């Protein structure tokens, strides 16, 4: 299958799971969006760009919005630092318990 076919199937499956019948981006509609870094897209366009992205051949995800909220900016999760800090605290606690 092509990237376009896989993307379309995932898109339709998501619509079905959410009970959404609207097509495309519209005011008030639920939206999860991905912005790719054009510099890593190797001048691909259309189907070729989608194939490159779906099959993971070097296209960098630059920004992501979930439910309209930006969760990835410049390739990094917006709460990455907080999550890493919380992880370190929990890891230290677990290691202390093992000693």
Regions found by a protein language model. Name each.
Residues 3-99:
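Active-site microenvironment of metallo-dependent hydrolases
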